[in-house]
């Protein structure tokens, strides 16, 4: 590696929108994220599933068929 051309790699503080902070390695000092493992639905278990009904199912439900 050539000396003097690579950015400094050090500890970086990651700040989530939910308020959680943790440290990782990066060339930046501070990283802001919108979602992390503390607030992501997959990790918290609050994941919702969306049921999409087709037009035929809606018709059957509406008219009791």
From Swiss-Prot:
Q: Which GO terms describe its biological process?
A: translation
What does this protein's record comment on cofactor binding? Answer: Binds 1 zinc ion per subunit.
Which keywords are on file for this protein?
Metal-binding, Ribonucleoprotein, Ribosomal protein, RNA-binding, rRNA-binding, Zinc
Q: Which cofactor does it need?
A: Zn(2+)
Q: Which PROSITE patterns match?
A: RIBOSOMAL_L31 (PS01143)
* Pfam families, per the entry: Ribosomal_L31
Any one GO MF term held by the record is: metal ion binding
Q: Which domain of life is it from?
A: Bacteria
Range of residues in the leader sequence: none
Provide the residue positions that the database annotates as binding Zn(2+): 16, 18, 36, 39
Question: Might you report a single GO cellular component term?
Answer: ribonucleoprotein complex
Q: What Gene3D superfamilies does the record point to?
A: Ribosomal protein L31
Q: How does it assemble?
A: Part of the 50S ribosomal subunit.
Q: What does this protein do?
A: Binds the 23S rRNA.
- Give the similarity note: Belongs to the bacterial ribosomal protein bL31 family. Type A subfamily.
Q: What is this protein called?
A: Large ribosomal subunit protein bL31
What is the species listed in this Swiss-Prot or TrEMBL entry? Answer: Carboxydothermus hydrogenoformans (strain ATCC BAA-161 / DSM 6008 / Z-2901)
């Amino acid at each position: 590696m050539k000396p003097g051309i690579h950015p400094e790699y050090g500890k970086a503080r990651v700040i989530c929108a939910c308020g959680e902070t943790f440290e990782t390695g990066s060339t930046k000092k501070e990283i802001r994220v919108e979602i992390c493992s503390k607030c992501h639905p997959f990790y918290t278990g609050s994941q919702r599933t969306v049921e999409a009904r087709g037009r035929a199912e809606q018709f059957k439900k509406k008219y009791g068929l």
